[in-house]
Amino acid sequence: MKLNELKPNEGSRRNRKRVGRGTSSGYGKTAGRGQKGQLARTGGKTRLGFEGGQMPLFRRMPKRGFKNVNRKEYAIINLNDLNRFDDGSEVTIDTLKSSGLVKKELAGVKLLANGELKVKLTVKVNKASEAAKKAVEAAGGTVEVI
């Protein structure tokens, strides 16, 4: 057996239906495109969201909001993420990056109070919610906003 002798199993691959090859094929004459109209013509298709000339839905809806170009996006760390660190250790942005909790280089790191903290830590982050600060201090640790 050679590579050029390999063939797929019988019936495992269907033949492509060739259109426009006579009326008895079932796909002759109009080749499955229907009668006249834009979709029967050659030369491309309509753009996404095109409704035949009717005002499309995305233009009927009112504009809303804007994107602030000066917005700062922070990497989010929750309290339950900090349980992987040893009791009494110091958690900085560098230790968060080396542990894989912070992947992207953003404006900084923000600590949020989702979950429960079970270890005593010294946390140094750019921002922290009030609830997160209280939870870290309740566990015996401190939060330092840098």
From Swiss-Prot:
Keyword Protein biosynthesis among record annotations: no
Composition bias type Basic and acidic residues, residue spans: 1-13
Signal peptide positions on this chain: none
Membrane-spanning segments: none
Keyword S-adenosyl-L-methionine: no
Top-rank taxon, per record: Bacteria
Biased composition (Gly residues): 23-35
Region Disordered, residue ranges: 1-54
Entries under Gene3D superfamilies matching the protein: 3.100.10.10
GO molecular function, one term: structural constituent of ribosome
InterPro entries recorded: Ribosomal_uL15 (IPR030878), Ribosomal_uL15/eL18 (IPR021131), Ribosomal_uL15/eL18_sf (IPR036227), Ribosomal_uL15_bac-type (IPR005749), Ribosomal_uL15_CS (IPR001196)
Gene Ontology CC annotations of this record: cytosolic large ribosomal subunit
This protein's UniProt keywords: Ribonucleoprotein, Ribosomal protein, RNA-binding, rRNA-binding
A GO biological process held by the record: translation
Subunit structure, as described in the record: Part of the 50S ribosomal subunit.
Annotated family: Belongs to the universal ribosomal protein uL15 family.
NCBIfam families tied to this protein: rplO_bact
Xref: PANTHER family: 50S RIBOSOMAL PROTEIN L15, LARGE RIBOSOMAL SUBUNIT PROTEIN UL15M
Described function: Binds to the 23S rRNA.
Protein name: Large ribosomal subunit protein uL15
Annotated organism of origin: Lactobacillus johnsonii (strain CNCM I-12250 / La1 / NCC 533)
Source taxonomy: Bacteria, Bacillati, Bacillota, Bacilli, Lactobacillales
Gene name of the encoded protein: rplO
